[in-house]
């Protein structure tokens, strides 16, 4: 069983600057909503003028830190409201389909943020208050981000698979193109709704062409991204950072390949809408690759009509107690594991980054050698995981297939994610009201 073939997706690393900028999710919602301040209705919830104003102030602070010229207030507010609507629709989808944010994970995230910034919780609270925020507001932000991240893992990332035939095709294409290139570029997206009418497509194309004309006249790319782009990275100036060509859509690669740093692409059309790219820099990839490999073993209990989630978890808790009391892990794996590795005492051999499903890899990476995890849920059931050892390995010989698998997975996951967001947004009942 290839329970350890994972899509390329991780929860974002928490950082104080990111959360203070509120670049991901909505701030805490008030219990009492003044009706005359409603600026949007999303299904059975509302967004208020006060929430929009708070989000605006946070984003302005963030753009100012980045030295990004500010768009006109009315333009940025409209952009932010659209983003808040989409985020709320995603949160609702997650909650309505059974996703929950574990309070323990929320508190751990807060503690990590404080530790990363060399603060205790009181210091973190003081830092937030200087930015006009609260600890409870940050908790809500983290909770909402966890909801969306878990829903994405379940609905998108864990359903991505990469076949050997796809890897072979990728490597053949790379061989024909020569050495792979990395691109540092920025991006503006004018999205087109699914099943858009010809009139909607013409309107979106006109918007994109107007942006392109402004760029040709010398307008600031980051400012136009913040005010007009529908992409998730719009409020960061649209910058993608460094991406290997194999992890990008072919449409982008073909546009970027002949460009020189500082140049802007013509209008590009994809299933998601109209794209404009600006090349910041490009470079060849390093020919060598060293990765941290993990030697691990596990015990898997599958769930079915007879074995419930709770039953599987409780069985593993009992097995972990026996391991903690001195019973050998491999003996229990041979007796109880329902994975093909049971005959080998649950031994999975050496695992590379990107080999396992997100839930499994995240839990495995948190363990020290010799440590046994608490029960971990994955799409395949419930696991106990033990890390035996780790090593840094020069995998130059394996590099091509490893990079190919990760590149294909990341590209497919990103495309599927954009489709997923668009479908949820289009399916939501949305009523936009005047902001002022």
From Swiss-Prot:
Subcellular location: Periplasm
Location, primary (coarse class): periplasm
Source domain of life: Bacteria
InterPro entries listed in its UniProt record: OMP_Chaperone_SurA (IPR050280), PPIase_dom_sf (IPR046357), PPIase_PpiC (IPR000297), PPIase_PpiC_CS (IPR023058), PPIase_SurA (IPR023034), SurA_N (IPR015391), Trigger_fact/SurA_dom_sf (IPR027304)
Reaction it catalyzes: [protein]-peptidylproline (omega=180) = [protein]-peptidylproline (omega=0)
EC number: 5.2.1.8
UniProt keywords, alphabetically: Chaperone, Isomerase, Periplasm, Repeat, Rotamase, Signal
Keyword Isomerase set for record: yes
Signal peptide residues on this chain, from the entry's feature table: 1-30
Keyword Signal found: yes
Segments passing through the bilayer: none
One term under GO cellular component: outer membrane-bounded periplasmic space
Name of the protein described by the UniProt record: Chaperone SurA
Organism expressing this protein natively: Thiobacillus denitrificans (strain ATCC 25259 / T1)
Taxonomic classification: Bacteria, Pseudomonadati, Pseudomonadota, Betaproteobacteria, Nitrosomonadales
Gene: surA
């Amino acid at each position: 069983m290839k329970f350890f073939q994972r899509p390329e997706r991780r929860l974002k690393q928490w950082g104080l600057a990111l959360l203070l900028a509120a670049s991901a999710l909505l701030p805490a919602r008030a219990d009492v909503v003044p009706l005359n301040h409603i600026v949007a209705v999303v299904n059975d919830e509302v967004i208020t003028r006060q929430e929009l104003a708070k989000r605006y102030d946070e984003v302005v602070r963030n753009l100012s830190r980045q030295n990004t010229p500010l768009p006109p207030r009315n333009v940025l507010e409209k952009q932010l409201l659209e983003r808040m609507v989409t985020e709320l629709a995603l949160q609702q989808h997650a909650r309505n389909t059974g996703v929950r944010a574990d309070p323990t994970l929320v508190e751990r995230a807060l503690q990590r943020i404080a530790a990363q910034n060399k603060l205790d919780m009181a210091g973190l609270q003081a830092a937030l208050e200087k930015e006009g925020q609260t600890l409870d507001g940050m908790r809500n932000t983290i909770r909402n981000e966890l909801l969306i991240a878990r829903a994405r893992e379940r609905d998108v990332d864990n359903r991505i698979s990469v076949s050997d035939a796809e890897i072979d095709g990728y490597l053949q294409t790379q061989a024909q193109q020569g050495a792979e290139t990395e691109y540092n570029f920025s991006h503006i997206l004018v999205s087109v709704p699914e099943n858009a009418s010809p009139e909607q497509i013409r309107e979106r194309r006109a918007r994109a062409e107007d942006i392109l004309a402004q760029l040709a006249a010398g307008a600031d790319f980051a400012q136009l991204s913040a005010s007009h782009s529908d992409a998730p990275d719009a409020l960061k100036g649209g910058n993608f950072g460094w991406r290997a060509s194999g992890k990008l859509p072919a449409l982008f690669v073909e546009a970027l390949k002949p460009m020189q740093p500082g140049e802007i692409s013509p209008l590009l059309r994809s299933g998601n809408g109209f794209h404009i790219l600006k090349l910041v820099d490009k470079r060849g990839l390093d020919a060598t690759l060293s990765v941290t490999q993990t030697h691990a073993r596990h015990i898997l209990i599958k769930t079915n009509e007879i074995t419930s989630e709770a039953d599987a978890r409780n069985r593993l808790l009992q097995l972990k107690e026996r391991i903690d009391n001195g019973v050998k892990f491999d003996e229990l794996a041979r007796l109880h594991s329902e994975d093909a590795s049971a005959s080998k005492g649950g031994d999975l051999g050496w695992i590379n980054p990107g080999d396992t499903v997100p839930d499994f890899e995240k839990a495995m990476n948190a363990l020290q050698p010799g440590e046994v995890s608490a029960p971990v849920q994955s799409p395949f059931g419930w696991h106990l995981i033990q890390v035996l050892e780790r090593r840094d390995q020069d995998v130059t010989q394996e590099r091509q297939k490893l990079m190919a698998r990760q590149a294909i997975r990341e590209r497919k996951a990103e495309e599927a994610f954009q489709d997923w967001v668009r479908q949820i947004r289009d399916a939501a009942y949305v009523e936009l009201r005047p902001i002022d």
